[in-house]
Amino acid sequence: MKVAVVGATGLVGRNMIKVLEERKFPVTELIPVASEKSAGKKIKFKGKEWSVVSPETAVSMKPAVAIFSAGADVSKEWAPKFAAVKCYVVDNSSYWRMDKTKRLVIPEINADVIKKSDYIIANPNCSTIQMLVAIADLHKKYKIKRIVVSTYQCITGTGKKAVDELDAERNDQTGTKTLAKALKNGIKNVNTCSASCYYSPRGTEGRKTTTAYPYQIDLNLLPHIDKFLPTGYTKEEMKMVDETHKIMRDNNIKVSPTTVRVPVIGGHGESVNLEFAKPVTLKEVYATLRKTKGVLLQDNTLPKRCSTKNPYGEQNKAIGAELPKYFSTSSKTAAGKKYLEQLAYPMPIYAKDRDEVFVGRVRLDPTVKSGINLWCVSDNLRKGAATNAVQIAEVLLSKKFI
């Protein structure tokens, strides 16, 4: 089967190619697609090298599936052209998501909506995907009335330029103080910045132009993802509202989001508060989450060695096998290793290159009649983008549309 990956040289595009190979999608011919300046570059896949071609050339090759991650403008122009030659398009951009004629799909939740005539299918926003995978089964069982979510979104969501920028800031290549200096001396502020200013306060060097963010990201948090709207919300925040309604097929769910960019890699974190229409118990919530497809429960905040008994039992010891790799100093002693094996909650560093949505810190919300708080983490380049897109292609395959 011919499969095109549009945006093959970007962070998400490279992950799409990786996931296609990992999941053994039946690709007989890979068509890596990028801009004219990348034409001729080589992409490795299944032990072979494949040449990058232009979108126009790719359309003429008539692939069965084209997975897009090249931005809204490219999707707007080229998705219909691929669809016109009976190629199914799975688009990771925001362009088609809220189009009433297009399906917006998380396979674990609403794969049933895909019909044979759906030649353009939208991939949801990364932050929406991980939240809904975590809570969709809870909604089926207890009916969610309201969601309050704050996101902690890693820099890879902005692309390679953001990764390079954070590296440069941390390596003191652009005037940013090193962490040690910053902790000792503090960070000077630059108080003069017009509404259109896209400069960053960077230590004693003052303001320097930045390519990825309006302000320094290292040692900082930016409550600003995508453009601000007249309401004061950002487009990223409204994506979570609108996409939740469309995917869950329930416009009555109230969604109140705040999205924040954080200087980490590995995945996005989300603090999620849910209010339900029906009564819940923690035991029932844990049982539901354990059975939720795509979710790995990592919630052991009261290890055995603590004097307080953990009423929820031991969850997912698998993380215990991973923890000592990253905390080698603490795990040198038997006691340290035992502690790390038992204490568990989701963290971005462990989500990297994984496809699960990790859920933890589950607890009742005492301020409402029926509600919980939870924390979820997922690799935004994988389940938040590439893996979800490939899973949609797998649905097309399972339905024998391709």
Where do the language-model regions lie?
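Glycine-rich phosphate/pyrophosphate-binding beta-alpha loops
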Residues: 260-263, 378-383
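A glycine-rich, Thr/Ser-enriched phosphate-binding loop motif common to dinucleotide/cofactor-binding enzymes
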Residues: 121-130, 232-241, 384-388
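Conserved glycine-rich beta-strand-loop-beta hairpin in the small C-terminal domain of fold type I
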Residues: 266-270
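N-terminal Rossmann-like NAD(P) cofactor-binding subdomain of oxidoreductases
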Residues: 1-197, 203-217, 252-254, 301, ...
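Short amphipathic alpha-helices in soluble, non-transmembrane regions
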Residues: 283-292
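Glycine-rich beta-alpha junction loops
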Residues: 36-38, 126-127, 151-158, 221-229, ...
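Oxyanion-binding "anion nests"
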Residues: 212-214, 218-262
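Short glycine-rich, acidic/polar surface loops and turns
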Residues: 342-350, 354-364
